[in-house]
Amino acid sequence: MAAPARDPPGYRYAAAILPTGSILSTIEVASHRRLFDFFAAVRSDENSLYDVEFDALLGSYCNTLSLVRFLELGLSVACVCTKFPELAYMNEGRVQFEVHQPLIARDGPHPVEQPVHNYMTKVIDRRALNAAFSLATEAIALLTGEALDGTGISLHRQLRAIQQLARNVQAVLGAFERGTADQMLHVLLEKAPPLALLLPMQRYLDNGRLATRVARATLVAELKRSFCDTSFFLGKAGHRREAIEAWLVDLTTATQPSVAVPRLTHADTRGRPVDGVLVTTAAIKQRLLQSFLKVEDTEADVPVTYGEMVLNGANLVTALVMGKAVRSLDDVGRHLLDMQEEQLEANRETLDELESAPQTTRVRADLVAIGDRLVFLEALERRIYAATNVPYPLVGAMDLTFVLPLGLFNPAMERFAAHAGDLVPAPGHPEPRAFPPRQLFFWGKDHQVLRLSMENAVGTVCHPSLMNIDAAVGGVNHDPVEAANPYGAYVAAPAGPGADMQQRFLNAWRQRLAHGRVRWVAECQMTAEQFMQPDNANLALELHPAFDFFAGVADVELPGGEVPPAGPGAIQATWRVVNGNLPLALCPVAFRDARGLELGVGRHAMAPATIAAVRGAFEDRSYPAVFYLLQAAIHGNEHVFCALARLVTQCITSYWNNTRCAAFVNDYSLVSYIVTYLGGDLPEECMAVYRDLVAHVEALAQLVDDFTLPGPELGGQAQAELNHLMRDPALLPPLVWDCDGLMRHAALDRHRDCRIDAGGHEPVYAAACNVATADFNRNDGRLLHNTQARAADAADDRPHRPADWTVHHKIYYYVLVPAFSRGRCCTAGVRFDRVYATLQNMVVPEIAPGEECPSDPVTDPAHPLHPANLVANTVKRMFHNGRVVVDGPAMLTLQVLAHNMAERTTALLCSAAPDAGANTASTANMRIFDGALHAGVLLMAPQHLDHTIQNGEYFYVLPVHALFAGADHVANAPNFPPALRDLARDVPLVPPALGANYFSSIRQPVVQHARESAAGENALTYALMAGYFKMSPVALYHQLKTGLHPGFGFTVVRQDRFVTENVLFSERASEAYFLGQLQVARHETGGGVNFTLTQPRGNVDLGVGYTAVAATGTVRNPVTDMGNLPQNFYLGRGAPPLLDNAAAVYLRNAVVAGNRLGPAQPLPVFGCAQVPRRAGMDHGQDAVCEFIATPVATDINYFRRPCNPRGRAAGGVYAGDKEGDVIALMYDHGQSDPARPFAATANPWASQRFSYGDLLYNGAYHLNGASPVLSPCFKFFTAADITAKHRCLERLIVETGSAVSTATAASDVQFKRPPGCRELVEDPCGLFQEAYPITCASDPALLRSARDGEAHARETHFTQYLIYDASPLKGLSL
C-alpha cells in the first residue's frame, strides 16, 4: 500500500536548500541530500522496485563522490582520469605512443641522419575496488514499511533505520574515497624505481645497454655507493640546506616527462602549471616546509571534468588523443583519421563543447619550488590512512645486516701508537692495549654502549656442530686425489731395534723425501697474504679451525707398514687437538707471543740469571759429553741419583764455575732431584737456577687451573684434562724413565681406545735390572719401572708417583725446552752397554788412610784427573776434556751403577681417540699418534765437530718429535744420506713409527713458532702453554668463559630492521586512470541482505621512461634493539651430539645456563626449543648476533668497508655471464676474489664449500635450524638464495636499462618498477651480498674518540682497532 500523502512530493524539501561554495561542495552536498530525500520519501511494499531504485542511485552517488574527493589530492596531478563505463566488458586495452628521436644537424663528414619514429604500445593494467555492507532483515522491513503499525514508535524506528543505512552507505563511500587514493598511490609506487638505482642507470647506460662486463661492474659499484649515499638522506643531512636541496633536485629531475600534455591540468593561482607531485609522510612534509622549501602558493586550480570513453560499433577507442580529453569518436576521427570538414560539421556541438573553457575549482594545496620545477607537496598519512587498518605505503621497512670483527689481531705495521703518552695505563701496570683484543664495544639503540666478548660465542662454538665434519670429508673426496708425498700423513708401526729405526726410515723414504718440501712445512713459512693467494693450491683444504684436511693414503689402517702402499689417495681429516696447531699464516707468531705476554702478567717469571744459565747450557757446543753419560747412567732413578750425589754436585759446580751455566737442564728428573737433594751442596746462585726452573714449571701447571672452571669428571677425566693437552694422560712426555705415564695412559676410558706399542710389542713392566740380569740386546716389550725408592713388595703395574710428576715432565719438555733450544735439540737413544763400560773403565789412585783427598788435578799426581793418570777413551779423559773437576771418592760412587742399570732405549708409539669433550660420530674413529722414548736422552747443542768423541759412539739420533729433531744433529748422524742434507734444515725428519705431523698432538706450527718467536723465554713459555689449550666444545667453553683468547677470532653478524619514511615523486599527467561503472551485487542471508560494490579500474603509464621515482627519506625508528644478543645453537636442531652422554648434558646445561637465548622449560619432544618470554622489553625486538670463526690474521681493513661476512664476494654483483659463474665466484678459490683481487678470500673457514661456516649457516645442509627467519647469516651462505638474488640483480639491471632505452612496438612495454627493487629497498644486503660495518672498537677509549668527533681519530692503537660506520645509517642518530 502506498505511503501517506502527507510526505512532500519528490525531493523538494531537502533540495530546496541551495548549497553554497565551490562546485565540488555543491556536488557533494547535493548528492547526500538527494539520497536522504529518496529514503525519506519513497514508501513501498514491493521489494523489487526498491532494489532497482536503490542500486541505481547508489552507483551514481559513489562515482560522483569518489572522483570529487580524489581531485582534492595531490595525486591527481599525476593522473589523467577518464570515465569508461564499459571497462568491465573490455578484453584487452592498449595505448600506442609515437616517439620522435631528436636529431642534431652537424657539419663535416658525418652521414645525414633521417628522422626516426619509434612506436610503443602499452597494455592497460586491470584493477578493481571492492566494498560491502549489509542490511538487517528488520531494517529492510522498516524501510519497506512492512513493519510499520501506525504508531509513533514505529515511525521513529523507521527513521533510525534510514539514518543507519545512510551511515553504512557513507562508510562504504568513504572506503571508496580512500581506496581510490590508496590504489593510485600503489600504482605510482609500482612504477617508481628507487632513486639509488635510477641515478646510476642514467649515468652509466650507453644507448640503454651495458655493453661490457666492465661497464656493468662500474654500474654496480656506483649502485652500491649511491644506495649508501642517498638512503635516509633527509635524516643524515641534518640542517645542511644546500645538501637537501640538491638531493630534492636529483629526486625531481631523475624522471622522464609524460608524453601526454592534457588540456586540463593543475596550476597555481597565477596559472603556472604544476610539474609533478611529491608524496611523503607528514613528518617529512612538515620538516621540508619549515626548514628547506619555500611555499610558492597555498592554493591550486584543479580540473573537475574528465574524458569519457564511448563505444561505436565493435571497436573500443582510447580516450587519449594527442594529449587531450575527447568525448566521442568524432574527435578521434578529427585527430587520428584526418576526416573532412563536412564530416566534422555534423559533430559541431561536440567540438564546441570540447573547446569550451575548462571547468576548474580551487583547493587547498602546498605548492613548492624545487629547482626550476613547481611541485605539489602532499602527505596522505593523516588525510587518508588515519584510523584505518591499512598501513601507509610510504612507511616501509628495511633490513640491514651489520658485520663486526671480534678478536682479530692487527698486522705488524698497524701495531703502533702516536706517542708514548697516549692512552697509557696506570703507573706500575702493564699495557693492556698491547694484548690481543677479546672484546668489542659499539653503540646500540638509544646510544647505549654495548659490549661483545668472546664469551658470547659459547652458544656457537661450544656445540657439537664444531666437531661435525662428515659432510666436509665426503664433499672434498668427490674428485680423486693423489697422495704424492705422504710424509707427515702416514704412521708406521714400530718394528725392530730402535738403534736402526732412523736409518731404516731414511732408506725407505729417501725417494719420497727428495721431491721437495712438504705442504705442512711450506705453509708454516707463508705469510697471511701468501696463504690467502689463489695460487695456493692447498688453500682448498683449509676448511675448519679445529681440523686438518690433507691428502693421505686411502684405505690403509694406521699404523701401517714401514712404507705406505702404492694406491690412490684420499682427503682425510684429523682433529687439530690444540689451538697451537692452527697454521701460522692464520694464527701468526706475533699474536701467540702477545697472548703469552698477557698470560705472563702477574705470574711467575724466571729471573734473567736463570734464563742466561739455561740458555747458555742449551747453546753450549762444548757441553761436557760425560754429563750425557751420567744422565743415561742415572736413568731417572732417584736411588742412583742419591748414590751419585757427590759426583753430580761436583759436576754441576765445576760446570757452573767454568761457564756460569747450569748442567743437566736437559732432564727434568735430574732438575727436580737437584732441587730436592742438593740444596746445601751447590752455590746459592747456581741452586737458584734449578729452583727457578721448578717454580716456573709449577706456575705453568697452575695456569691450566686458572683457565678451567670447576665441573664433574667426564669420561673418567677431570675438566682440566679435557681443557689442556699437558694435563691429558693420553700424551706422554717425549722422554720417560719410568712407566707412570704409560700406566695412566692405558687406564683411560675405553672409548678413547688407548694403545701403546713398545718397539712392536706390548709393554711389560719390570722392577729391577742389574749387571747380572741386564740384556742390552733385548728386543721385546720389557720396560724398566723403578725410578723411585719403594718397598720391596711394591707392585710393578701401578704408578709410583702422583700425576703431577708426569704433567711437569710434559710441561718441561714441551714448553721450557723449546723456549730455550728453539728447536735445535734432539732426542737420542742410548747405547747403555758402551755407557756402562766407559763409566766403569777407570783407575782411581789409592789414598792412604788419614790423607786428605787430592783437590788439584794439575799439581797433585794423586788426583784421578792428573794428566799422568789420564787414559784414552776413559771416563777420566772425558772429565778432563770437559774441564770438569771431580775427586776420587766421587768417581768411586760410579760403582753403584752395577746394581741398578738400564738396558736399552725403547721407541714408544701411543695412540688415543679424542676425549669425551670432543668425541662425536665424526671423530670417534680418529686417532692421535704420539711418540716417546723410554730411557732416552735429550741432546742439546750439536757437537759433531768435537772429534774427541766419535759421533754415535754412545748415543744414536732418534727424533721423537719435530720439536726435538734439530737439523744439525740429524744431518750429521752417521750414514745420513747427503742428498737429504738440505732438506733436513727445513723438514723435521721424524720416523713415521714415532708419529706423523697430521696425526700428532703437537704439530709443525708449534715448532715453527718456537723457532721464529722474537719473545723472551718467559713470554714464550706462556705463549706455548696457551697454544696447548684444546679445541673442543668443552675446552672452548672453559677458555671463553675464563677470558682466554682461543687463537681465532669471529666475524659477528647482526641484522636489524628499521621503519623507514619514504618519498615519492611523480611527473604531471604520467598515469592514465580509467574508471568503470559501479556494480552492486545483492546476496540474501538468513539475517538480512549483503551488498557488495565493485568498480573496475584500469591504468596505464604515459611515459617512454620512468615517470616516477621513490627514495628512502629517513628512519622513523628501529624495530630491533641493535644489541648484543648472542645466538644459541642449542635452540636449533643441532648436529650429532657428543657420544659421551654426561659430557653432552653438562655442555648443554652449562651453555644454556649463561645464555639469554636459553630454551624455555619444559623442552619439547619434537621440534625446536622455544625461547622463554621475558617479563619486559625496552629497546625493541632482540637482534641476534651470529658468530663466524675467523682467523686472527684476517686483514682488519676488510671490515672497514661493506663486505661479505663469508670473507669472499658472492652474488650478481661480480658474477659473469656464463652458466655457473655464480657458483664459481662463491667457491672457486683458484680465482681471486673480485672485491679483493689480491686475495682469494679473507676467511677460508667460511668462504669455501664444506667449510665450517658453510656447514653451519648454509641452508642446504639443514643443520642447526639455519633458516632465513632464525639466522642473519643464512642469506650469505645458501647458494640457492644467492643465485636467486644474483638473478634478481641481473634482471633489475637489465630491465631498468631496457626501460630507459628506446623501445619499439615489438612488445608491450610497461614502465613498471623493475623486479628486484623491493629487495633493493627492503633487503639490500641480501641483494648486494654485503654487510655493513658499524662504528665499533676493541677499546672503549677509541670508541669514545669517535663519538666525540675527534679530528682524525686514529683507527688503531697497538693491537686495538677502531672501525668507522660505512653503512647507509652513517650520520643518523638512533
Swiss-Prot record:
GO molecular function: structural molecule activity
Full protein name: Major capsid protein
Family from the record: Belongs to the herpesviridae major capsid protein family.
A single GO cellular-component term on record: T=16 icosahedral viral capsid
Lineage summary: Viruses, Duplodnaviria, Heunggongvirae, Peploviricota, Herviviricetes
Gene designation per UniProt: MCP
Function summary: Self-assembles to form an icosahedral capsid with a T=16 symmetry, about 200 nm in diameter, and consisting of 150 hexons and 12 pentons (total of 162 capsomers). Hexons form the edges and faces of the capsid and are each composed of six MCP molecules. In contrast, one penton is found at each of the 12 vertices. Eleven of the pentons are MCP pentamers, while the last vertex is occupied by the portal complex.
InterPro entries, A to Z: Herpes_MCP, Herpes_MCP_upper_sf
Organism: Human herpesvirus 2 (strain HG52)
Assembly behavior: Homomultimer. Makes the hexons and eleven out of twelve pentons. Interacts with triplex proteins 1/TRX1 and 2/TRX2; adjacent capsomers are linked together in groups of three by triplexes, heterotrimeric complexes composed of one molecule of TRX1 and two molecules of TRX2. Interacts with scaffold protein; this interaction allows efficient MCP transport to the host nucleus. Interacts with capsid vertex component 2/CVC2. Interacts with the small capsomere-interacting protein/SCP.
TM segment ranges: none
